[in-house]
Amino acid sequence: MSQVKVAVRSEEAANSYTQTFGMSWRQWRQACSEEYAKQCEREVLHTVDFIRENEKDPERLVEVVDSKIYDNDGLVHEVCVSDKATGKANKRSIVYMHGYGAGLGFYFRNMDGLTKGVTKDFNSYFVDWLGMGNSSRPPFDIKGQTASEKVEETERFFTESLETWRIGHGIEKMILVGHSMGGYLSAVYAMQYPERVEKLLLVSPVAIPENPFASNDDAEVYNSVASSAVHAVMDEPPLSNVTNEVLQTQEETTGLEPSRPSKPKNPLPRFITFLWEQNVTPFSLLRLSGPLGPKLMSFWSSRRFSTLPPETFRALHNYCYSIFRLKGSSEYALGNLLAPGAFARRCIMNRLRMLKCRTIFMYGDKDWMDDVAGLEATNRLKEMNIEAEHHIISNAGHHCYLDNPEDFNEIVLKEIRMSLRSFSSISE
């Protein structure tokens, strides 16, 4: 049976994985090419038995592909898992999209469980968004002047590239899974191309609730309900969503260490808001840090991936740094789509009527994302006679697919089985 190794590290061991200055310097000098980033991705994928020794797997064929969608800077990077015996033809498709600034390699703990016994009916695609991961990094040149124009143009950058990729693969309809910002963009894709999405699985999606701090500069102006929320928030501001993403450890999210209570924080400092509005991303700061970059990032990675065994941790750290270091591209979408603090400039909640397919919301029980908004969206969809479900995954944070792959996989596999039963009944 293919497995991914799991180990629990002590706090002392976890701290030992922060890099020395010498290690940081060496990695900085090495991590400056697309080939290095792909090599690091291979090292992550090869921690999975059936991928590392794919020739021995009797069922699944693993292909790493760069699909050309545009003439210039238009390669979309993917891992496809299909059936060795029958190939890809006449199969249904399930497509997994990663979150902001990440890459398809983040799904490495899910690839075995999500594809074993599935390839006879489904081709599984793990895809890097254009401008992220190991896909091409075209210039991100948004010409819109108003916030609304920037949102629309930025959303089209992602949805049109995904649609062009779909057409190139001859996929008629797909189950679409998206995490965080990838969930937001997947939802927008489903709104723009409803006939192409069979089901929508949103994994801790950003941009669901209204922005209580919205102003006339944003794509939508806050209403009276959101306005009242401002006062509630300002009475006792919660820990910043963005801050939580940096500070939460994997021990906390997986239940191996008690969660620290959130401490009230003031709204984001003005200089952070200024940097956000100027599209200064975390990755641009990482690039500017030069030889210190890998060491600085190791403070984050040693916390975020703190329960993984040493070799897996190192592979994932190297992978993250290698793709973060590549030329900036669609990472600059952040400030166009989200206001400072990670609220949407144009939220999904106010566009739910455009969704036409069964929609699943998933959150970790220690998620910093607003799962209550996901529950409200679920209820609103049901009121519109759209099938919807809301799931909380135990012992997991924002990256619930990574923290608790077994429970996450089971929810996805349930939806796959339901689709197969529905398809069989229609065929009969």
Swiss-Prot record:
Key words of the record: Hydrolase, Membrane, Mitochondrion, Mitochondrion inner membrane, Transit peptide
Pfam family, one: Abhydrolase_1
Segments carrying motif GXSXG lipase motif: 178-182
Lineage: superkingdom: Eukaryota
Chain span(s) of sequence motif HXXXXD acyl transferase motif: 398-403
Location of the AB hydrolase-1 domain: 93-217
Protein name: Probable cardiolipin-specific deacylase 1, mitochondrial
